[in-house]
Every structure is written in structure tokens, then in C-alpha cells.
Amino acid sequence: MPADSTQDEDAVLSYGMKLTWDINDPQMPQEPTHFDHFREWPDGYVRFIYSSQEKKAQRHLSGWAMRNTNNHNGHILKKSCLGVVVCARACALKDGSHLQLRPAICDKARLKQQKKACPNCHSPLELVPCRGHSGYPVTNFWRLDGNAIFFQAKGVHDHPRPESKSETEGRRSALKRQMASFYQPQKRRSEEPEARSTQDIRGHLNSTAALEPTELFDMTADTSFPIPGQPSPSFPNSDVHRVTCDLPTFQGDIILPFQKYPNPSIYFPGPPWGYELASSGVTGSSPYSTLYKDSSVVPDDPDWIPLNSLQYNVSSYGSYERTLDFTARYHSWKPTHGKPSLEEKVDCEQCQAVPTSPYYNLELPCRYLPVPAAGTQALQTVITTTVAYQAYQHPALKHSDSMQEVSSLASCTYASENLPMPIYPPALDPQEGVIQAASPSGRAPLKVPGDCQAPRPTLDFPQEADPSGTDGADVWDVCLSGVGSVMGYLDRTGQPFSFDNEDF
């Protein structure tokens, strides 16, 4: 071949071949004046002297597939040829040449390479080893000494040249570009359905009507709506509450998941109603302005707690919302059925005193003075009317043990219908407490002894100085109903009261 002959001539004419030296000599030629050109395909027993500034020589570059081998001399680099990788069927390429691949340097990579198929005919590949040096691979030696790099080759390659390292790198890069161009459309095609599915999902989410913010449900009191845990219905004119839940779905301890309704209407019982007394600085918060309001349909409220004969509403949160229950228990009134008898009459000399202390005894006796004139009977009528204001009919009422008949109330005169009557609450001194009641004849004071004083409210009411008060007492204007209202209430309840052989 012309290339081989030219290379042989260059080897004969090389400067390194003119000098006598061996790579294993202890002393190498010093300061050579000429250097050889770099040879990529050295073959045969040749010697070259390269300059230490030659880049390819510094890299120990060779067209043959050479790998590093063990060398006991640290100053000499020894490399052996690996051979060439060819097709097992010796197929020809389009240009008529044969496939001659460069063997991999790593042993594992080389074994993996042999298992691959020929890219041209898909036949298996095989490695043709180099045996050009007396049955051993051709060996190349590199040694740096001074300003020269000495190169020596031993053996003649008995196999065809593999593709060079630059050619191999170019082929690999071209193959990578081809594979990238092959997978890129597939990747785009695979990404397009994902993008379309994502857009579909987004479009579905966008098309779905967004949930409106939780509406503030208007809460109004309704006496016909039962609420578990609060059986007492509320009354009109109560405060409007706003919550964000659906109470009709609550059934005891079972809480169903929240469901949104377009226009829910949930009802809460409003604040319980109480009394309303007109006085200086004391005004109840009840929506009912009179004491004779019919309360026969009002059931027991579990939120009411009797303390000191006063009804406290534990669910009330207003500082001025208090409910004072003037019940028949204060004066040992006793319901009767049928004809009144001696056992069913009320003893006014034995009544239950209700002190302001939180600890009291219900059995403590209290006595009234002897029955005074007509003005006092009007006061007794006031007490009877107050009993008609009883809002809670407890099933078990305490009765007084001792009974005593009281003088007849035949001469008792009743207040006219809805006539305001001032009542003076007891003063600080129990002995000087004055209570006046309205009657056709006017106001008549009544002295109450200390052991049977009227119950005082223990609640905190805003008190103001009353210039018209008598002995520091406040005037309470109570709108009382006539006898008709009281009798109508008693007829509906079916429990008339007997007081001194007189049925009411």
C-alpha cells in the first residue's frame, strides 16, 4: 500500500532511527537537535523522538486501539494493542468497505460490545485480537527524558486498522444526534396527549361553577321548630343570629357532613323572655310588656336553673337580660282540683322565706301580720295576679305542712284591667319595708315583718337614684290584669287556687 510504504520510508528516514538507543537504556540521547513528526499509525519495529511540546505525543495518542499494561519501570509507559472488532459475516457497507470497529478499552465494556449486533446486517460482532509480536499483542513504549519524548514500537499488527479515535468519536456523536432526533418527536407526541389531558382537566375545572363562599344564614326565632338540647322555643322580636352550619341535619350526637343549600333558613331559639318592671333604672328585656301574659304553652326550659327562688338562664349572654320568676312557691300556693277543702287551703302564716344568701332552708317559717283592711286585700290580689304570671308549672310543687284558714276575701277589690300599680320593693331594713298596691281607693302601705320579707332579686341591675322614692325604695309600675284574665288562665290550666274558701 502506498501509505504503508510512505510510512516505512519515513521510519527509515526518521531521526530516531538514525540514533542508537533502546527504550530500556539507562541513559537516553541528550539534547537531540532534531525531532520527528508525529505518526498516528506506527507499525513494525520503529523508533521516534518527539518534542516534549507535541500535544499528541503528550497524550500518547495512537490510531491503534492501545491499552495500558503493567510496567515495572515507572519512567516508561507501556501499551499493548487490543485488535479490532469486525462483523462475524464480514458484511460490506454501502461504499464497499467492511465494518472495523475500535475495541473498547475496558474489559467489561468490550465484552458487552461483543454481544451487540452488527449495525449493518444485525449479525453478531467478534473481536480480532492482535498477535503481531511473536504471538503477543504489539507493544508501544513511551518515555519522557529532558526535552524529548521517546517512542518505540515492537511488533507488526496482523489485523486491519480499526477506525481512529477521532472517527469513533464523530460516529458516536452522529449516532447520538440521530437518536435524539428520533426520540424527540416521540417525546413531543407523548407530551401532547398529556398537555391535552391537562388542558381538558383545567377546562373542566374552569367550566365547573366555583363554589360560592359560605353564606351567612339568617337565623330567626321560631316557636314551632324544636331543637335537640334546647326544647324551649323562643319568642318573637329576638335577636337575629348568623351561623354557618345547618342545624336541621343535627340529630342528637350524629353529625352529618355539611351540605350547602341555596337559601337555607335555620332557626335558633332567641333569648328567653322575662319580666318587665318599670322603675327608675330597672327595665327588663322581655318582649312582653305586661305580667299577665299567657304562658300556658311554654314548656320547661332546661337552660333555666332555680337559684334563691330566682330563675337564671344559663344561656343568656346579655348583661341586662335577667328573668325573675315570681312563682307560687314563694308563698306556698297550692293547686286544687274540684272542691276546695281544708287540706287544699293556703296558710299565710307559714310561708317559705327566700333570703338573698345562696344557701337557705326551704323549711324556714315566715309569718304575715293579721289580715289588714281593704288595701291589704288589694296586695293579696297582687300576689294572686303574680301567681298567674307563673311561666313554669313544675310537676312537684312544695306544699306547706300546716294549714290555716284566712279571713274571707269577699270584700277584696281587684284592680281594673291593665291598671298600672306602683310597688315599692323592700328597703334595706326588713322591719321598715313598705309595699303599696293599687286599689280603687288609692295606695295603702303594708308593713312586712323581718322573718317574712318579700324575695329580693339577687341579680345585678343598674340602679339609679330615684328622687321620688320613699325610704330609698324603688317604685315598680306593674301592669296587672283584671280578674277575667286571671280566671281565664286558671281555667285553661285546670288547676284553680283556693285561698280562704274562695276559688280563683
From Swiss-Prot:
CC per GO annotation: nucleus
Keywords: Developmental protein, DNA-binding, Metal-binding, Nucleus, Transcription, Transcription regulation, Zinc
One Pfam family recorded for the sequence: GCM
Binding site for Zn(2+) 1: 81, 130, 157, 159
Statement: the UniProt record of this protein carries the keyword Zinc: yes
Transmembrane feature ranges: none
Primary location class: nucleus
UniProt key word Transcription: yes
Function according to Swiss-Prot or TrEMBL: Transcription factor that binds specific sequences on gene promoters and activate their transcription. Through the regulation of gene transcription, may play a role in parathyroid gland development.
Protein's recorded name: Chorion-specific transcription factor GCMb
